[in-house]
């Protein structure tokens, strides 16, 4: 289970180092690798342990291909999905097309989101977080379904 926020860097070759805590969390999955794809809603990447991704892909494969919204989602998620390995130093080489989509430069923010990680440009994440914390966004959170959550 992934949680927490982590600041990391990308080297000149496009490799991102996973913090030790996240490597430990990933090791619990006993998978040979990870899958990284784009987020169809935000300018970030989604990193899944291989076994978690396979469950998602099974659901995506069952969507009706003649439904435009389903096809769009399949193209975005599966079309950009890339199998990657974590090297012995705990680094992942992020492909250039994925880095370009998420506007990743040298400084990244990794957010634990349960069964997946979100990989953001630090600048993009800070702007998004400020937007989430704005008064209008906070008022949007006050829906009936959110009232059942106690923090």
UniProtKB/Swiss-Prot annotation:
GO biological process: negative regulation of DNA-templated transcription initiation
Binding partners and assembly: Forms oligomers.
GO MF annotation terms: DNA-binding transcription factor activity; transcription cis-regulatory region binding
Domain of life from the UniProt record: Bacteria
UniProt KW Cell membrane keyword: no
PANTHER family: TRANSCRIPTIONAL REGULATOR MRAZ (PTHR34701:SF1)
UniProt family annotation: Belongs to the MraZ family.
Protein's name according to its UniProt entry: Transcriptional regulator MraZ
UniProt-annotated location(s): Cytoplasm, Nucleoid
Keywords: Cytoplasm, DNA-binding, Repeat, Transcription, Transcription regulation
Alphabetical list of CDD domains matching this protein: MraZ_C, MraZ_N
């Amino acid at each position: 289970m992934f949680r927490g926020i982590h600041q990391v860097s990308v080297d000149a070759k496009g490799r991102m180092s996973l913090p030790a805590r996240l490597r430990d969390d990933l090791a619990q999955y006993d998978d040979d690798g990870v899958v990284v794809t784009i987020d169809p809603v935000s300018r970030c990447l989604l990193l899944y342990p291989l076994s978690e991704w396979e469950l998602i892909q099974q659901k995506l494969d069952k969507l009706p291909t003649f439904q435009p919204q389903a096809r769009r989602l399949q193209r975005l998620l599966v079309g950009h999905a890339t199998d990657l390995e974590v090297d012995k130093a705990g680094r992942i080489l992020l492909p250039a097309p994925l880095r370009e989509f998420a506007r990743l430069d040298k400084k990244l923010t990794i957010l634990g989101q349960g069964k997946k990680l979100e990989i953001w440009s630090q600048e993009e994440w800070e702007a998004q977080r400020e937007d989430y914390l704005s008064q209008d966004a906070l008022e949007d959170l006050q829906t009936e379904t959110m009232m059942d959550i106690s923090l």
